Amino acid sequence: MKARIRPYVQACLVLAMIGLIAASAYAEPYELSKNDVMDPKAIKSPDISLFGVKIGDSEAKAMDVLVNEKIPGIKVEQEALFIFLVDQRKPTGPMAGVRVQDGKVDMIFINNRFAYKTRGLFRNVLNSESPEDIRKLLGHEDYGDENVMGAVLAYDKQGFVINYLGKDVNIEFSPVH
């Protein structure tokens, strides 16, 4: 009797393992420096990570990953609520970082100085020439404001805001509203 049941139990375990692996692959976050996600509808701020740090992670994890682990080519600075990542080649200002409030990461930001490290759709956004180029990549924003100085494109349903100021493009990821 045991000999007959064993293959069925093994088959069930194998199928369960395959299901778990597939589910974890589907829920994999968009690591800004690694993944080539190109579907704008698939991007939500809770799935975004910056060198492994996601919105909602503890301050301890952010400090450990961004400050204590050495990231090649990046200098880390901490000021008040922010952990800034600065390009060692051209240390003109932060190229990315996180904001920590109440012991948790509540915002991730990147700008066009981080474009060379970014993969996927946001590399194209950071290298955009106009707000219209950004709309072609991401679709029309939930709301925004455009004037002679630049544009603010808010994609609140996905949890990010793009500030376009001529040559400077900033993207802020925050919890979905």
Task: Describe the function of each predicted region.
Residues 2-12:
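Bacterial N-terminal signal peptides that target proteins for export
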Residues 11-20:
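Bacterial N-terminal signal peptides
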Residues 16, 51, 123:
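Generic anion/oxyanion-binding catalytic loop in active/binding sites
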